[in-house]
């Protein structure tokens, strides 16, 4: 199945590997369906490596004055979380089938487990778990194989004005970043040369988990 990320720099259509990583795919699709990714920033950009987003605690879902996304929990913790919160979303590593072997790979940004009894980490089976954050590679990143869950890929990377062109626009965006690649987003109505990097909304083309 596929979804389209409507970003500030164009549309990215991505294929999801639902059969290979069902829990991870279900989490991503459910967050998309709930509107949790709407108006959230790409908060990290490292050209030649990856762009990272999906922190639902940085969007209106966490501080909504209007419609609140239908999520199975009340409060969104800092950094975001999975739909299984307070239980953990464990890694679904599949080597050698699913690897960070090319440009346009969609993968989860994991975080370390510090306390297995803490909300979001309950039931963790490994040293790291997943939440809501994800990244898209700009190049092969084999050092991440075995440590991050690959769950999709950008489609139409060779087509002009489609996935490949948009991914290039995101990679080349004029943004202000710190030494770790964290993007300093321009403030609303601020006059600046720097660009905003954001997911505006998401379109789900087919949801195999819908009931």
Swiss-Prot record:
This enzyme's EC code(s): 5.2.1.8
SUPFAM superfamilies assigned: Cyclophilin-like
UniProt GO BP: protein folding
Domain PPIase cyclophilin-type stretches: 1-204
Any one Gene Ontology molecular-function term assigned to this protein's record: peptidyl-prolyl cis-trans isomerase activity
Catalyzed reactions: [protein]-peptidylproline (omega=180) = [protein]-peptidylproline (omega=0)
Annotated keywords: Isomerase, Rotamase
Listed GO CC annotations: catalytic step 2 spliceosome
Function, in words: PPIases accelerate the folding of proteins. It catalyzes the cis-trans isomerization of proline imidic peptide bonds in oligopeptides.
PANTHER family named among the record's database cross-references: PEPTIDYL-PROLYL CIS-TRANS ISOMERASE-LIKE 3, PEPTIDYL-PROLYL CIS-TRANS ISOMERASE-RELATED
Annotated family: Belongs to the cyclophilin-type PPIase family. PPIL3 subfamily.
Name of this chain's protein: Peptidyl-prolyl cis-trans isomerase-like 3
Organism: Emericella nidulans (strain FGSC A4 / ATCC 38163 / CBS 112.46 / NRRL 194 / M139) (Aspergillus nidulans)
């Amino acid at each position: 199945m596929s979804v389209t990320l409507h970003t500030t720099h164009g549309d990215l259509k991505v294929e999801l590997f639902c059969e290979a990583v069902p829990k991870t795919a279900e989490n991503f699709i459910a967050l998309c369906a709930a509107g949790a990714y709407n108006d959230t920033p790409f908060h990290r950009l490292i050209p030649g490596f990856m762009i990272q987003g999906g922190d639902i605690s940085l969007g209106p879902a966490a501080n909504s004055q209007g419609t609140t996304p239908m999520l199975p929990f009340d409060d969104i913790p800092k950094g975001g979380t999975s739909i299984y919160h307070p239980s953990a979303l464990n890694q679904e590593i599949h080597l050698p089938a699913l690897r960070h072997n090319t440009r346009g790979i969609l993968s989860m940004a994991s975080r370390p487990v510090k306390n297995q009894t803490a909300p979001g980490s309950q039931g963790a089976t490994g040293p790291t778990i997943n939440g809501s954050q994800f990244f898209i590679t700009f190049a092969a990143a084999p050092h991440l194989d075995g440590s991050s869950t690959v769950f999709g890929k950008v489609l139409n990377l060779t087509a002009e004005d489609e996935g490949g062109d948009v991914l290039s626009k995101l990679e080349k965006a004029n943004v202000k970043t710190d030494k770790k690649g964290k993007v300093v987003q321009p403030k609303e109505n601020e006059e600046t040369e720097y660009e905003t990097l954001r997911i505006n909304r998401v379109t789900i083309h087919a949801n195999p988990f819908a009931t």
